[in-house]
Amino acid sequence: DCVRVFVSDGNLVLEFVQPERGRKSRSFDMKDVKLSAVVRMPELTYLRLSGASKLTTGDEFAAGARFDGALSGASSARGLSVSAGRGELRLSGASSADLKARFDEAFLMQLSGASNASVDVRSDDVRMTCSGASNVKVGVRDAGHTGVRLSGASQATVSGETVDLKVECSGAARSDATALTAQHASVSCSGAGSADVEVTGELSVVATGGSSVVYGGDAAIVSQSVGRGASLRKR
C-alpha cells in the first residue's frame, strides 16, 4: 500500500506514499526502504533520474525520432543502449552514465558539476559541452563533425574517427583527442587549458594565456595565433 505505480501523460511513475501514523500495518521507516523495479518496455524516448536513484538496462531501446535523457544528484545509469534520429544527454551534480547509442542525425551531451560519462556513439554530428569538474570519455564512429567545448576543470577523452573536429578549452580544462583521427581540426585554448589532437589534414590554432596545444599526424597548419605564455608544438 505504500508504493504507487501509475501512468501519467505517458510516463511510468513509481512513487512512495508516506505511511499514516499509528497504523500498525505501516509501522516502518521509509528511510529504510529501497525501491527496486523491473520494467520491460519496447521504447525509451525520455529518461530522468535524480537523487540517488540507479538504473540498469539490458537490451537496446528504440526511441524513434528523439531521445532525451537527464540525470542529476548522485543518480546513475548503466548499460544504457539507445537508437534514435537525434539524442541529448544532460548530467549534473555527481551523476554518472554509460551509454552506447546510434543517433542518425545528431547527439548533444552536456555535463556539469562532478558528473562523469562513458559514451560510445555512432552519429554524423557529435557535440559535447563540459564544465565544472566533469569528466567524459567518448568513442565516436562515422562522425562528420565532432565538437568539444570544455571549461572549468573539466576533462574529455575522445577516440575514433571524424571528418571535422572543433575543440574549445578554457580555465584549467583538458581535452585529449590523441586517439581521435580528424581530417580537419580547429583548436582554441585559453587560460590554463590544454588540447592534444591527431590531424591528417588542415589545422587552425588559437592559443592564449598559459594554454597549450599539441598535435600529431600529418597536420598542415593553415592558421595560428599563439599568444605570449601559450604554446603550440608537434607531438
What are these regions (language model features)?
Residues 1-72, 76-92, 96-112, 118-129, ...:
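Acidic (Asp/Glu) and glycine-rich low-complexity loops/linkers
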